[in-house]
């Protein structure tokens, strides 16, 4: 088989249709085990894939409305009065673990509405 120069290869590509060029690219990818995707695009996709899907809600501070926060902790966790009070009195306290990120944000908003400070981890 005769060896093609770069110029000859490019000239042969100029005579092909887009569909034929696409077939050549796929054949090269299969033959050499490589991808024609741009490295920048692959690097940009990585942070999107790393976006968290779960969060843990942690009570940092009860604020001024401690009684309201205790009631909310009981409602959310199902803890008894003493356990809920203990959690509120000794921050940081994990309220709920491994929640859907959207549910965790909604729960954080509930706590902030009664004056508590909450973090999502």
From Swiss-Prot:
Keywords: Ribonucleoprotein, Ribosomal protein
SUPFAM superfamilies linked to this entry: ClpS-like, Ribosomal protein L7/12, oligomerisation (N-terminal) domain
GO molecular function list: mRNA binding; structural constituent of ribosome
GO CC terms: cytosolic large ribosomal subunit
BP terms from Gene Ontology: translation
Function: Forms part of the ribosomal stalk which helps the ribosome interact with GTP-bound translation factors. Is thus essential for accurate translation.
Protein family (similarity comment): Belongs to the bacterial ribosomal protein bL12 family.
Subunit structure: Homodimer. Part of the ribosomal stalk of the 50S ribosomal subunit. Forms a multimeric L10(L12)X complex, where L10 forms an elongated spine to which 2 to 4 L12 dimers bind in a sequential fashion. Binds GTP-bound translation factors.
NCBIfam families referenced in this protein's UniProt entry, alphabetically: L12
UniProt protein name: Large ribosomal subunit protein bL12
Species name: Mycoplasmoides gallisepticum (strain R(low / passage 15 / clone 2))
Lineage: Bacteria, Bacillati, Mycoplasmatota, Mycoplasmoidales, Mycoplasmoidaceae
């Amino acid at each position: 088989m005769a060896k093609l120069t770069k110029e000859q290869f490019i000239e042969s590509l100029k005579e092909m249709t887009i569909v034929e060029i696409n077939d050549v690219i796929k054949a090269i990818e299969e033959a050499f085990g490589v991808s024609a995707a741009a490295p920048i695009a692959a690097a940009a996709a990585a942070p999107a894939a790393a976006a968290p899907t779960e969060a843990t809600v942690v009570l940092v501070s009860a604020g001024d409305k401690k009684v309201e926060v205790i009631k909310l902790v009981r409602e959310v966790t199902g803890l008894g009065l003493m356990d809920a009070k203990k959690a509120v009195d000794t921050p940081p306290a994990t309220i709920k673990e491994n929640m859907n990120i959207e549910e965790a944000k909604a729960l954080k908003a509930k706590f902030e509405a009664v004056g508590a400070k909450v973090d999502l981890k």
